[in-house]
């Protein structure tokens, strides 16, 4: 039985840990699997699979996050050397090495040590990309480029780049990674029906419970569920304003923030929900976690105004729970080839005065000047800024949070024109909340563990066949290490969408 070595900074509960659990479940009978990561950072996201017979965890403290301000070049080199020595201790030429988010800028010493290790040893390797630092994570980007000037994407026969969505798969190929070195591996999702029988739940009873908890909900309204944590990229104030303009629904948001960085945004969202003008309930599960299945049951629509997602979980959740959904149109929609047009909206427009537009543009100019990229690349962003702000109607998600809140608190008479401007959104909400579960083009089987397992074996066959091939055999891949790939990836993210003022609040 061959070894599979999996690397990530930590295994805290979250997206990457879910993926790792699914990898382990799919391969536990075919490989001896060892998970490497920082125990100190957390491993609660993988505890479930550590009981399997062929699965081990090895504490690798050096893989934990490091930080820009506390890492000088000497520290970087010492840490890199320590990581390389450990990797050499676990060198197995028959093993497959699988690293997650090695490019993210959370530990540049690991990034460079791992890259040098797999290229010099010619090890069959999967580098799975969940996120890019160039996508709204400029601190990470600056950190990784503080120490690494070479390409993060070496092209070798032994290296496969796996992405969790089709958009990023196409991005890699457009940016210069050969298709034979790229693999599309969408996440698997496992759902379990609630064991408690709740079909006969009385909607009025649930609404009364919410009222007793202090929420401003109307029992005659429809219920729009936004199942999310209160984090900036979820763009929750947009959902608040859309709900307010629709005027016939309660907006139900499930969770508060989960990190200190999100607390200022959480405070604004909390204050907005406390207004009498807003019908709904915020952070329900923090007040009473037992209510969630009942909230789910009485919901008439799943909704998301999120502006950044790596995976379309909400589409699968809504399908599983037999609920209709409406979301912002994001790149992850490409993963759902049959999704219906009624399922999403492109933008939510609000009217700004020329003075307000200039103020917002000034804030973006300040933002652009802070980003650690060339002046030429900054000019790409300035051009995009001018294009997106050349009319008096601006996408709500581009506004600073303070201005978003102001719109949410505005007198109703001043908001009426927004209903007509965004009529298509409200027509969709009306239809989706007035009909029972309709076919919106989502197939759960495409994202089942069974489908995932078959894709993983295709990926492993590919990396083993190409990695073990003699030079000059197995396709046309040349050994390339060219920063033009990195530059192209950077340019692919140079839009105002990725430096929204929302992200830096």
Swiss-Prot record:
One term of GO molecular function: glycosyltransferase activity
Lineage, broadest ranks: Bacteria, Thermotogati, Thermotogota, Thermotogae, Petrotogales
Domain of life of the source: Bacteria
pH curve summary: Optimum pH is 9.0 (at 60 degrees Celsius).
Temperature dependency: Optimum temperature is 90 degrees Celsius.
Reactions performed catalytically: (2R)-2-O-(alpha-D-glucopyranosyl)-3-phospho-glycerate + GDP-alpha-D-mannose = (2R)-2-O-[alpha-D-mannopyranosyl-(1->2)-alpha-D-glucopyranosyl]-3-phospho-glycerate + GDP + H(+)
UniProt entry keywords in alphabetical sequence: Glycosyltransferase, Transferase
Annotated control of activity: Not strictly dependent on divalent cations, but the presence of Mn(2+), Ca(2+), Mg(2+) or Co(2+) stimulates activity.
Name under which the protein is recorded: Mannosylglucosyl-3-phosphoglycerate synthase
SUPFAM superfamilies found in the cross-reference section: UDP-Glycosyltransferase/glycogen phosphorylase
Description of how the protein assembles with itself and partners: Monomer in solution.
E.C. code: 2.4.1.270
Gene: mggA
Reported function: Involved in the biosynthesis of the compatible solute mannosylglucosylglycerate through a phosphorylating pathway. Catalyzes the conversion of glucosyl-3-phosphoglycerate (GPG) to mannosylglucosyl-3-phosphoglycerate (MGPG).
